């Protein structure tokens, strides 16, 4: 008798390994990147980049349990994307900024936060099994790309960044 998959949202849900948490995190990340793409249709390059990143975050997702799908070429593409956005917003990212602005920028900041959670989940996986270093590089860079994209979208929308000065660390940085 075939299993009825309507009662199973994810086949690995009952596993106790951290790989499952990483996969759920990166699924959430890809979903939020998809939301961000729907809010940036008026910015075609951002929209296209986000659709690409949604797909790549799923490749990152499967690269722990399965074959490593993230390759050096993918890391280079992401690095070039980062450089392209930094060139546009360099003057706006010299300080820590509040996650605010347009709805699209706020969703991109949420994506950035999800990417950081994915990095943390990947670290947890690495305490249980070997994780290719390229996956860490990609996940960290992805968070940074999403940050500069958020700032870029605010720039396109004519919204100024609001600097944040931390009272806890101001003498330590």
PLM regions: where:
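Phosphate/pyrophosphate-binding loop motifs in nucleotide- or prenyl diphosphate-using proteins
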Residues: 1-173
């Amino acid at each position: 008798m075939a299993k009825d998959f309507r009662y199973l949202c994810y086949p690995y849900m009952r596993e106790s390994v951290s790989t499952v948490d990483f996969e759920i995190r990166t699924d959430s990340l890809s979903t939020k990147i998809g939301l961000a793409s729907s809010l940036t249709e008026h910015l075609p390059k951002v929209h296209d980049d986000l659709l690409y990143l949604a797909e790549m975050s799923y490749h990152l997702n499967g690269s722990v349990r399965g074959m490593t799908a993230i390759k050096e070429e993918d890391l280079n593409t992401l690095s070039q994307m980062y450089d392209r956005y930094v060139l546009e917003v360099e003057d706006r990212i010299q300080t820590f900024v509040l996650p605010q602005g347009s709805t699209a920028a706020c969703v991109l900041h949420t994506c950035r936060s999800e990417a950081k959670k994915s990095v943390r989940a990947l670290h947890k996986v690495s305490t249980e099994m070997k994780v290719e270093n390229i996956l860490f590089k990609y996940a960290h860079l992805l968070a940074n790309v999403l940050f500069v994209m958020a700032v870029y979208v605010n720039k396109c929308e004519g919204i100024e960044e609001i600097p944040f000065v931390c009272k806890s660390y101001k003498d330590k940085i």
